Design a protein with these regions (language model features):
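Periplasmic-binding protein-like
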Residues: 114, 130-132, 195-204, 242-268, ...
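Extracytoplasmic ligand-binding site segments that recognize negatively charged/polar headgroups
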Residues: 37-42, 81-82, 87-223
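A bilobed periplasmic-binding-protein/Venus flytrap-type ligand-binding module shared by bacterial periplasmic
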Residues: 133-140, 175-177, 259-271, 289-293
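Mature extracytoplasmic/periplasmic domains
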Residues: 265-325
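Conserved C-terminal helix/tail region of periplasmic/extracytoplasmic solute-binding proteins
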Residues: 322-350
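Sec/Tat signal peptide C-region and signal peptidase I cleavage site
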Residues: 21-27
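A ligand-binding cleft/hinge motif common to bilobed small-molecule-binding domains
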Residues: 92-94, 229-247
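Early extracytoplasmic/lumenal segment of secretory-pathway proteins
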Residues: 28-95
Length: 350
């Protein structure tokens, strides 16, 4: 149907032009981009569809896998076909510095004081607080791991492990497994000796690692029994527990948390509507619905107080879950991602 419609439009335009008339301009619908999976399914129900009904116009949504290069290519080519995009912290910092995003109208958002400090940026509005943590199947492991040292212990907990295929998170977890305290992780990783120490620890586990590249894969690996435990996004784990009745467990001590943000691409056709959408998605009464579907923390401070206790206990921002968690050091990864990625890839190929 899409092909037929486009062909008809082109034919009509050709007739108009041949008659010496100006061809009509067809406005593109507001397009919102997020991370896919059960998280985007929840967003569709909580944000996308209700906002579409509110404005009386379609809202399209697409999924992506991240990467500042994707946004750079769209913006620098002119007339980007995305409007509001959810980005990770590094993409927010790099894109804002590079002029890839519109400035946020914080008055429209209700004011900066409504949000956690880490959710406020000139170019972005915090969308979720999420964690990468240890996960395992509680039906298969009655006494599961409680630390990254346990994750590395294949004698006590036999079976394969899964980690994200890349240096970020993986190197931090290796150092935690080797006994580095959470408060010293980035100080140690900032030295050549610390990097070597992390890779040496990874050497121990390498024969037992199944690498994952998309957020859905850890769930698949656990469900199939291919791995005994994995690193995973906490919201994906609680999401599948609720939607499919799984008994997957999340281990918050030693987890790494970060804030994802909404941005509006520079010169996007629907930039004003995109700001309106972000304001709608940031309302406390709307954000408070998210933990019913996926257990991500909420940047709007009022929203957090509206979440029932049965759901709030699963959030990364719950006080008990934050106790031994680590904040992702965005500046460290902006400065070191390229070098450490090259080193990681070389290590992987050995």
């Amino acid at each position: 149907m899409k092909t037929i419609f486009k062909s008809g439009v082109l034919a009509a335009a050709a007739v108009v032009l041949s008659a010496g008339l100006v061809a009509p301009v067809f406005a593109r619908d507001l397009t919102v981009v997020s991370w896919g999976g059960n998280y985007q399914d929840a967003q569709r129900n909580i944000y996308f569809k209700p906002f579409s009904e509110k404005i009386g116009k379609p809202v399209l949504d697409e999924a992506w896998d991240g990467g500042i290069g994707v946004i750079q290519s769209k913006v620098k080519a002119g007339a980007p076909n995305w409007d509001a995009v959810q980005v990770e912290a590094e993409e927010l910092a790099l894109g804002c510095a590079d002029g890839l995003y519109e400035k946020i109208d914080w008055d429209k958002m209700g004011g900066k004081d409504k949000f956690l400090d880490s959710a406020v940026n000139d170019c972005g509005v915090g969308a979720i607080v999420w964690s990468t943590a240890i996960a395992y199947d509680g039906d298969k492991l009655k006494e599961g791991p409680t630390s990254w040292a346990d994750f590395w212990n294949v004698e006590k907990f036999p079976g394969k492990r899964s980690l994200r295929k890349g240096p970020k998170y993986t190197l931090e977890f290796a150092l935690l497994a080797d006994g580095v305290s959470k408060d010293e992780i980035y100080d140690v990783l900032g030295t050549e000796e610390g990097v070597a120490r992390a890779f040496k620890k990874l050497d121990e586990l390498k024969p037992n690692i199944v690498w994952w590249e998309s957020g859905a894969q850890p769930l698949q690996f656990l469900a199939s029994g291919e791995v005994a435990m994995t690193s995973a996004y906490n919201g994906r784990i609680t999401g599948i527990n609720r939607s499919e009745g799984k008994n997957f467990k999340v281990v918050f001590p030693g987890s790494i948390y970060a804030v994802d943000s909404w941005v509006v691409l520079k010169d996007a056709e629907n930039k004003d509507a995109a700001q309106d959408f972000i304001a709608f998605a940031s309302l406390p009464e709307n954000q408070a619905k998210l933990p019913e579907f996926v257990a991500y923390g909420l940047p709007n401070k009022e929203a957090a107080s509206k979440v029932p206790a049965d759901f709030s206990k699963d959030l990364p921002t719950d006080s008990a879950n934050m106790t031994d968690a680590i904040s992702l050091n965005v500046d460290f990864w902006i400065d070191n991602a390229e070098t450490l990625t090259q080193r990681f890839n070389a290590w992987l190929a050995q």
